[in-house]
């Protein structure tokens, strides 16, 4: 059993391991999402960000080197929950704009988690005097924010398409916002 973190240095290392695991899971989830996406722009965004995420894993390995610790992950329960939710949603929704809208929403949930974690790690790295690590983490943070903005733009278009599909398909929405027969 690992000892509980007691210092900011310990918290930084434990969070870094958590994010390392999460980022590797993200690469797999993005590849799976790219295969599942029907909307071409969304598929391309997933493929591009999967490549970026692979580079981010390499960047995290550099951060481990900078702090003199082995690059190893620890199970990230948040990422496991987010990917499990994505899997469940993929099973629950049919193909088409609604499924793509759900994929985009799941991907954004991952991006928001990563933005929060990278922002924290970047700040802690600066406070701990790991300036080179802070620069690497800042670079990744900016990529995550850019990916989130792109997903937002794509999601707006997909959501409109999904709404149009609902209107054309003769389905209506109940007061709770869900489709009713």
Language-model region placement:
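Amphipathic alpha-helical hairpins
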Residues: 1-181
């Amino acid at each position: 059993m690992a000892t509980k973190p007691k210092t900011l240095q310990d918290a930084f290392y434990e969070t870094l391991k958590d994010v390392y695991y999460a980022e590797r899971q993200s690469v797999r989830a993005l590849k799976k999402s790219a295969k599942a996406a029907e909307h071409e722009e969304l598929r391309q965004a997933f493929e591009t960000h999967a490549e970026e995420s692979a580079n981010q894993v390499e960047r995290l390995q550099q951060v481990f080197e900078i702090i003199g610790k082995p690059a190893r992950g620890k199970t990230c329960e948040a990422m496991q929950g987010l990917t499990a939710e994505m899997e469940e949603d993929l099973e629950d929704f049919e193909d088409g704009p609604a499924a793509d809208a759900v994929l985009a929403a799941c991907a954004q949930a991952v991006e928001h988690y990563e933005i929060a974690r990278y922002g924290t790690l970047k700040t802690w790295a600066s406070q701990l005097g790991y300036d080179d690590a802070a620069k690497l983490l800042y670079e990744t943070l900016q990529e995550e924010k850019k990916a989130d903005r792109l997903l937002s733009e794509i999601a707006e278009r997909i959501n409109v398409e999904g709404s149009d599909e609902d209107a054309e398909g003769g389905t209506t929405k109940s007061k709770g916002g869900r489709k009713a027969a």
